[in-house]
UniProtKB/Swiss-Prot annotation:
Family matches, as InterPro entries: DnaJ (IPR012724), DnaJ_C (IPR002939), DnaJ_domain (IPR001623), DnaJ_domain_CS (IPR018253), HSP40/DnaJ_pept-bd (IPR008971), HSP_DnaJ_Cys-rich_dom (IPR001305), HSP_DnaJ_Cys-rich_dom_sf (IPR036410), J_dom_sf (IPR036869)
Location within or outside the cell: Cytoplasm
Family: Belongs to the DnaJ family.
Necessary cofactors: Zn(2+)
Alphabetized HAMAP family for the sequence: DnaJ
Taxonomic classification: Bacteria, Pseudomonadati, Pseudomonadota, Betaproteobacteria, Burkholderiales
Subunit annotation: Homodimer.
Annotated domain remarks: The J domain is necessary and sufficient to stimulate DnaK ATPase activity. Zinc center 1 plays an important role in the autonomous, DnaK-independent chaperone activity of DnaJ. Zinc center 2 is essential for interaction with DnaK and for DnaJ activity.
Compositionally biased tracts (Basic and acidic residues): 35-48, 364-380
Biased composition (Basic residues): 24-34
Species whose genome carries this gene: Polaromonas sp. (strain JS666 / ATCC BAA-500)
NCBIfam families, alphabetized: DnaJ_bact, PRK10767.1
Protein name (Swiss-Prot/TrEMBL): Chaperone protein DnaJ
Amino acid sequence: MAKKDYYDTLGVPKNASDDDIKKAYRKLAMKHHPDRNQGDKSKVSEEKFKEAKEAYEVLSDENKRMAYDQYGHAGVDPNMRGGGPGAEGFGGFAEAFGDIFGDVFGGQRGGQQRGGRQVYRGGDLSYAMEITLEEAAHGKEAQIRIPSWDDCNTCHGSGAKPGTKVVTCTTCHGHGVVQMRQGFFSVQQTCPQCKGTGKLIPEPCVACHGVGKTKNNKTLEVKIPAGIDDGMRIRSTGNGEPGTNGGPPGDLYIEIRIKKHEIFERDGDDLHCAVPISFTTAALGGEIEVPTLAGKAAIDIPEGTQAAKQFRLRGKGIKGVRSSYPGDLYCHITVETPVKLTEHQRKLLKELDESLKKGGARHSPSEEGWADKLKSFFSA
C-alpha cells in the first residue's frame, strides 16, 4: 500500500513554513495521541498519530525535506529515523513537543559544543598573598608558585596507554551528549558513559590515569599595583585549571591580604596613627615629629592640647588604585602620664597641683572646672 503524502498527512501545502508544520503536527498529535484515545479499539487514532509523527520527522528536518521534495518517499532513508516510526513507540510526541517548547524557551541545549562534544571552561583557582602596608602603598613585583597542567610525557596528552588507542564512545557516538525524554520534553544531557568527551579510553595511561595531563608547578610573575587594598583580587587570565575537550582554561585570582602594621591603620585611602606626647608638651605646646609612609613629618602642638585631639596631614595617606589623589594621615594625640617619678619630681608636681587648684576653673579646658561641677551637683 502506497504511503500517503506527508504534506497531506499534516494538512499543509508544500510551501508551508517550518512554523506551520510544527503547528499542524502539534494539533494532530494532541488529537490522536493514544493517551487521549484509550477507548479507540480500532487503533485508528494510533495509526494517524504514527503517520503524523513520521511526516513531521521528515518535514521538520531541512535535509530530509529537501530529499523528500525531490525524490518522494524513496529519497528518505528510514534508517535515519532509528528504525521507522513504530520503533520509538509514542516517544516522538515528546520529542516533537520538546523541539517546539525548546524554541519557545530559547532552544538551549546544554553547554557550548565543539565538534559535537561538550566543551567546558576550566575552573578558577585562588591564591592568597600577604604583603606589607608599605608594599601595598608603593606596589611591588613578586613571584609565586602555582599548579600547572602539562601534557603527559608518557601518552603525549592522549590519556591512552602507549600502544593503545582512544575509541569513540558507543553511547553518544562521539557527540558527548545524549537525548533524554522527560514527559513531553526532550532534554539534552551530558553522556554518562564518556562524561561529555565523546571518547573512551579502554586502557588508560598509568602515568596520568587517563587524564592526558600531569600536575606540575610553575613560577608566575605578579605585579602588585600601588594603592591596592586588603581583600582586593588580581586576575591572571588563563592560569586556572585546564578546560575540557578543548575548552578555555580558567583564571587565577590572587587575593591580597595586608599584614597588620605596628603604627598605622588603613581606612580606604586614609591612614590613622596614635601619637603619644608628654603632659608637659600637651600643656606648654611644642613641635613634634610623627611618622609617615614616606618618612617623618613635623606637627606643631599648641599649648593646652587635650588627649584625643586629632591632627590631619593632607596627602600623607595612600593613593588608591582608583584614586586621583592620595588620602590623608590622621594623627590621634594621646597624653602620657609619667611613671617612676623621683622625689624631686613628685615635689614639683605637688607644687604645681597646689598652684592649679588655687587657679580653679581658669586652668580647665572647660568653661566650668570639674570641681565646680561637683560643687554644683552636691549643692543642688
